[in-house]
Regions:
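A glycine/threonine-rich phosphate-anchoring loop and its flanking beta-alpha core
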Residues: 15, 113-202
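Glycine-rich beta-strand-to-loop/alpha-helix junction loops that act as flexible
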Residues: 71-72, 102-104, 237-238
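ATP/NTP phosphate-donor binding region
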Residues: 1-98
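Solvent-exposed alpha-helices and their adjacent loops that cap or buttress functional pockets
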Residues: 31-32, 92-94, 117-119, 146-147, ...
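Non-catalytic interfacial helical region
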Residues: 85-99, 111-126
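Active-site segments that bind and position negatively charged phosphate/pyrophosphate groups
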Residues: 198-297
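Short glycine/serine/threonine-rich phosphate/pyrophosphate-binding segments
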Residues: 106-113, 134-135, 244
């Protein structure tokens, strides 16, 4: 198992290993004493892991309930957020209690935003089940929901208390979702750690090291600039055009696919302005092609 400390104002650990969901309750109880807990997940992930994680929480002494919502970016809105808040009130959750996000980036963003705002802030844990969430959003501290026509327009910075990355969960993902996550890996390689690129060609079963290297890159930027005002903005590489493409596609294109296209556009613009080496766009395209990611709309 790999353990990385995320050095923010409230430091926490990210644990990376196969099988963590089986003992999620035990690992969470090491950091957050058993209390009332609400597990937040979408209907797809719930069918795979919801009951298993809920039972693990019960075994560890948590008084746990589960909130499930329809999967997809379309659910990351104020309506679902309000439904979650209503559920927390119905459970009589207090500031001594916790939320747990089980799923991909949508779940992490929604649960994290609820944790940041309910009773002016409660603790929460991230249990990412997609490669994209493991490499990116689960350790970012950025939480948000979408507003009409605006992605992540209503949100807050709120760090989790623990992140559990169970790499065995990646075995259930279709190839497209693996490629979706590799886009963020390629982004991290371009901006900070080119030596990790060969890791993107490893079998999914060997992704513990890949996840650890990416979390380390993310931690480096977040620890220097938790509020995203200076250095952390390097992590937005590919996202300026990427978010626009994602919205214009009606979210039919995955986030990583849109970031991939955005990176190509940004690199070509930089090449045209003479602020990057001439071979950079071609190198990025080669890596994206190897990861089966789009390079144009």
């Amino acid at each position: 198992m790999r353990t990385l400390t995320i050095r923010t104002q409230r430091p926490y650990n990210a644990l990376i290993a196969p099988g963590l969901l089986d003992r999620a309750g035990q690992e969470i109880a090491r950091v957050l004493s058993p209390c009332r807990a609400v597990l937040v997940t979408d209907d797809t992930v719930d069918a795979l892991y919801g009951d298993k994680v809920l039972e693990s929480l019960h075994r560890a002494g948590f008084d746990a309930a589960k909130f499930t919502f329809p999967h997809g970016e379309e659910s990351k809105n104020m309506q679902t957020y309000q439904q979650l808040l209503d559920f927390l009130c119905a459970c009589d959750l207090t500031r001594k209690d916790i939320l747990i996000a089980l799923g991909g980036g949508v779940t992490g963003d929604l649960c994290g935003f609820a944790a940041a705002t309910y009773l002016r802030g409660v603790r929460y844990a991230q249990l990412p089940t997609t490669l994209l969430a493991m490499l990116n959003s689960s350790v970012a501290g950025k939480t948000a929901v979408d507003l009409p026509g605006r992605k992540n327009a209503c949100g807050a910075f709120w760090q989790p208390s623990l992140v559990l990355c169970d790499t065995a969960a990646l075995d259930t993902l279709p190839e497209r979702e693996i490629s979706n996550g590799l886009a963020e890996c390629i982004k991290h390689a371009v901006i900070a750690d080119a030596e990790m690129l060969p890791l993107t060609r490893l079998p999914v079963a060997d992704y513990v090291e890949l996840a650890a290297r990416n979390v380390a890159v993310k931690e480096r930027f977040v620890s220097q600039d938790e509020r995203d005002t200076t250095q952390r903005q390097f992590l937005n590489f590919g996202h300026t055009a990427g978010h626009a493409i994602e919205a214009l596609s009606g979210y039919q294109l995955r986030h990583g696919e849109c970031v991939a296209i955005g990176m190509v556009l940004a690199a070509r613009i930089a090449q045209g302005l003479g602020i990057c080496a001439p071979d950079v766009p071609a190198a990025i395209i080669q890596s994206l092609n190897a990861a089966r990611l789009p390079i144009r709309c």
